[in-house]
Amino acid sequence: MALSSRARAFSVEALVGRPSKRKLQDPIQAEQPELREKKGGEEEEERRSSAAGKSEPLEKQPKTEPSTSASSGCGSDSGYGNSSESLEEKDIQMELQGSELWKRFHDIGTEMIITKAGRRMFPSVRVKVKGLDPGKQYHVAIDVVPVDSKRYRYVYHSSQWMVAGNTDHLCIIPRFYVHPDSPCSGETWMRQIISFDRMKLTNNEMDDKGHIILQSMHKYKPRVHVIEQGSSVDLSQIQSLPTEGVKTFSFKETEFTTVTAYQNQQITKLKIERNPFAKGFRDTGRNRGVLDGLLETYPWRPSFTLDFKTFGADTQSGSSGSSPVTSSGGAPSPLNSLLSPLCFSPMFHLPTSSLGMPCPEAYLPNVNLPLCYKICPTNFWQQQPLVLPAPERLASSNSSQSLAPLMMEVPMLSSLGVTNSKSGSSEDSSDQYLQAPNSTNQMLYGLQSPGNIFLPNSITPEALSCSFHPSYDFYRYNFSMPSRLISGSNHLKVNDDSQVSFGEGKCNHVHWYPAINHYL
């Protein structure tokens, strides 16, 4: 029965084949197992012979255990011949420098900035290699490869990196960075620390400066390659890593996530703290104490203000030499703490009960009284006296330019001991403006009316019998007199129980200068 062409196509004969064709294929199929057995036996003999030949040198070599800090990978056995085999068989070790800092970053989650122009890594990859042949030449290179094919995002509320999706790294051509010292002898490589601090990361896919091209928000890890120099390979001319004769090392703690701006604030603080090139971002107030200490060593001081709330004050009657830093009851005055030798505050005021100036009425005519005081740095606790000119000399004076200044010695502003002199003739008193202290190492500071620091022909260092300290300079300070001093209603109590009031016309405020210059 004849079959149609369509039925013949689906027949058993068409699917299985004719018997004549099957008979011709049978002897070929019968010969194939015999050939397979022969080839398998020859391969087994070759393997046994090669294993027997390599067994002796392998027994003599020490067993190499994988390093805990680095993982090594080797290229294929072909290409470099004996040189590649020797490189692979050698126990080459590589140690990461600064591993503690890398681990600290890794615990938080290392982030690396990438920019169009290229950004250097911090921390940078720095390694130390051992086990190289001192006489051979080696290249050392580094590349950065993705850890996985995931894209990440930073979750701020949990401070963690989360997977945001998959990505494709095939669009980026992998690059590697050859160390500038390559090629170099194994002895030189083992003697120095190999640093890749000049390598830069970029996200510019069109970069032509040799930077490592990466994608943002991805995880990468750097790998360090040790390549033995061969005559057929010139790493300075090629742009990709050779696949033969290479030993590769990588470190778990050097993994990082690429970002265009730091996401974790802890990473930002740690990089600012540890990166010497980030000092511009540090808090300038940390060095403020050191700068203040340097400024304190200079001889100048900032301007200060004297606040005379009330000019009158009470002192112990009949005791002209009593210190005003102690009150009548014997308790220490607030001035004692304000004017201690160790306290040089730029702002202070004199309380009411601590500024006592016992003097007779005749010593305060209607004249201008410029005020000077003297600090004696060597006699800290010695109370210096105050001696005023004779009343006749003060009464005959009409202007402040012909008056001797009212001198008051203050030992380091620790006390204000003031006395008056009732004995002696007017001629002696007119020439004696100030009792000379026992100290010879002194300095004069003045509160003077506008003009010269000392009145001409009124007082000289020889008349004072004191020498000026060579390390001090004169500086000028201005402050205004308070209104309470001008129109105050308080009185000055003197030793003979008499009172002098500004309102009685003894010291008319018209003759007082509204401002007094403080020369320091």
From Swiss-Prot:
Q: Found in which tissues?
A: Seems to be expressed at a low level.
- Which disorder is it connected to? Cleft palate with or without ankyloglossia, X-linked: A congenital mouth abnormality characterized by fissure of the soft and/or hard palate, due to faulty fusion. Some patients also manifest ankyloglossia, a condition in which movements of the tongue are restricted. Complete ankyloglossia is due to fusion between the tongue and the floor of the mouth. Partial ankyloglossia is due to a short lingual frenum or one which is attached too near the tip of the tongue.
Q: What is this protein called?
A: T-box transcription factor TBX22
Query: Per the annotation, which location comes first and is thus the protein's main one?
Result: nucleus
Spell out the Basic and acidic residues composition-biased ranges: 33-49
Molecular function GO labels: DNA binding; DNA-binding transcription factor activity, RNA polymerase II-specific; RNA polymerase II cis-regulatory region sequence-specific DNA binding; RNA polymerase II transcription regulatory region sequence-specific DNA binding
Q: Where is the composition biased (Low complexity)?
A: 67-84
| DNA-binding residue intervals | 96-283
- List the Pfam families hit by this protein, alphabetically: T-box (PF00907)
The family database entries (InterPro entries) matched by this protein are listed as: p53-like_TF_DNA-bd_sf, T-box_DNA-bd, T-box_sf, TF_T-box, TF_T-box_CS
Q: What does this protein do?
A: Probable transcriptional regulator involved in developmental processes. This is major determinant crucial to palatogenesis.
- Tell me which SUPFAM superfamilies the record gives: p53-like transcription factors (SSF49417)
